[in-house]
């Protein structure tokens, strides 16, 4: 019986609406879209590209010419880039035709690198060191599970990164055979449509410091009981701000 009453204001609104303003819609589309730069070309590698020193990708799209295998665990042979200790990868777009994205064998810097469609993981931080891994700018989307997998020790800083439609932005390895204390500092993140922003193992002393904005992200920081038994899955302990998960709730909307 209330339908006519609801319909009348809508008709009046339509009758007196202002003319269509395309600039308004363009602004909304730009805000909601994934801000990946335009590609300057494409490169397909038959094997992983090893990087020592600095590799500037010139904003070309890089891939391996293969179909994503989903969440089936790959290895170094499936990566697009493998960065040696201390290497820098910048100004590159990782295409959808790959499995393992980028691997770091030690400390590394990832600057203005974009993943169009994440397969198994976008970025895997490996090795046994305790250095610093820096992710500056860039972004990733369409990750069924993890974007950044932190297997090594040390510190990860993630600055001004955009992530959309994801399982986890960052996950400290929950069941690696060798475990470490890991820290992650995230600032200026723009996250939307995700399950959890961060996952850490607080029983190993992991900490996460987080700032930025998040829209439609179910959990910001999740604590797990990590294990060094690769045959077991880590147990979830809880989520929300704590001594290990350092942020102010709620994060602002993007």
From Swiss-Prot:
GO molecular function list: pectate lyase activity
Catalytic activity: Eliminative cleavage of (1->4)-alpha-D-galacturonan to give oligosaccharides with 4-deoxy-alpha-D-galact-4-enuronosyl groups at their non-reducing ends
Cofactor: Ca(2+)
Glycosylation (residues): 175
Entry note: cofactor: Binds 1 Ca(2+) ion per subunit.
Residues making up the signal peptide according to the UniProt record: 1-17
Renumbered residue ranges of the record's region Disordered: 227-254
Protein EC: 4.2.2.2
GO CC list: extracellular region
InterPro entries named in the record: Pectate_lyase_PlyH/PlyE-like, Pectin_lyas_fold, Pectin_lyase_fold/virulence
Subcellular location: Secreted
Keywords of the record: Calcium, Carbohydrate metabolism, Cell wall biogenesis/degradation, Glycoprotein, Lyase, Polysaccharide degradation, Secreted, Signal
GO biological process entries: cell wall organization; pectin catabolic process
Family, as annotated: Belongs to the polysaccharide lyase 3 family.
Name of the protein in question: Probable pectate lyase E
Organism from which the protein derives: Neosartorya fischeri (strain ATCC 1020 / DSM 3700 / CBS 544.65 / FGSC A1164 / JCM 1740 / NRRL 181 / WB 181)
Lineage of origin: Eukaryota, Fungi, Dikarya, Ascomycota, Pezizomycotina
Gene that specifies this protein: plyE
């Amino acid at each position: 019986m209330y339908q006519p009453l609801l319909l009348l204001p809508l008709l009046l609104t339509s009758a007196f609406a202002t003319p269509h303003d395309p600039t308004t819609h363009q602004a909304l589309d730009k805000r909601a879209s994934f801000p990946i730069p335009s590609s300057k070309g494409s490169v397909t590698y038959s094997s992983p590209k090893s990087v020592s020193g600095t590799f500037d990708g010139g904003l070309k799209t890089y891939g391996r010419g293969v179909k994503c295998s989903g969440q089936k665990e790959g290895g170094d042979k499936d990566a697009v880039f493998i960065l040696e200790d201390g290497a820098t990868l910048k100004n590159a777009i990782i295409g959808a035709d790959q499995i393992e994205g980028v691997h770091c064998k030690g400390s590394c810097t990832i600057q203005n690198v974009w993943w169009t469609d994440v397969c198994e993981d976008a970025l895997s931080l490996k090795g046994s060191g305790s250095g610093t891994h820096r992710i500056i700018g860039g972004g990733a989307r369409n990750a069924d599970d993890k974007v950044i997998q932190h297997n090594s020790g040390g510190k990860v800083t993630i600055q001004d990164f955009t992530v959309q439609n994801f399982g986890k932005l960052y996950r400290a390895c929950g069941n690696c055979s060798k475990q470490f204390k890991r820290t992650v500092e995230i600032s200026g993140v723009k996250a939307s449509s995700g399950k959890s922003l961060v996952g850490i193992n607080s029983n190993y002393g992991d900490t996460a410091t987080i700032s930025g904005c998040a829209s439609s992200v179910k959990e910001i920081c999740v604590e797990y009981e990590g294990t060094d038994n690769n045959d077991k899955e880590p147990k979830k302990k809880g989520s929300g701000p704590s001594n290990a998960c350092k942020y102010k709730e709620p994060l602002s909307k993007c």
